[in-house]
């Protein structure tokens, strides 16, 4: 469960390493985001020479959460960390690689490019 001021690891090679959540998109007064939700973030740590610079305001989609998500069959999927992938306005990732596993719920929310780039879909 991601909320305002939450820090997330960046799971792509866009140049950002850590982002801080500014706003959860999707309705007025919405407080929390889960896997597959789009958030507005600012870059807190970045690698030198990357596409994304420190202090830049970006949009990202949450791909892993510690809280996890409940599936229709009653099972839960949880991860060891909170992670996001920085995206463009057309929902495609800014980077060219995705690191670590992503949840199957991204496929239902039309983030097909992220799912296809991910090394593992759980």
UniProtKB/Swiss-Prot annotation:
Any one Gene Ontology BP term: translation
Superkingdom assignment: Bacteria
Molecular-function annotations in GO: large ribosomal subunit rRNA binding; structural constituent of ribosome
Record keywords: Ribonucleoprotein, Ribosomal protein, RNA-binding, rRNA-binding
SMART domains per UniProt: Ribosomal_L14
Family named by the database record: Belongs to the universal ribosomal protein uL14 family.
Name this polypeptide is given: Large ribosomal subunit protein uL14
């Amino acid at each position: 469960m991601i909320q305002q001021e939450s820090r997330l690891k960046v799971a792509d090679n866009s140049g950002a390493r850590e982002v801080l959540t500014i706003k959860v998109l999707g309705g007025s007064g919405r407080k929390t985001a889960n896997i597959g939700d789009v958030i507005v973030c600012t870059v807190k740590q970045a690698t030198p020479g990357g596409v994304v610079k420190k202090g830049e305001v970006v949009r990202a989609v949450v791909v892993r959460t510690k809280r996890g998500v409940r599936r229709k069959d009653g099972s839960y999927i949880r991860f060891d960390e909170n992670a996001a992938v920085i995206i463009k306005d057309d929902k495609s990732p800014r980077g060219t690689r995705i690191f670590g596993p992503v949840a199957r719920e991204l496929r239902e929310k039309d983030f097909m490019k992220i799912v296809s780039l991910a090394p593992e879909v759980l």
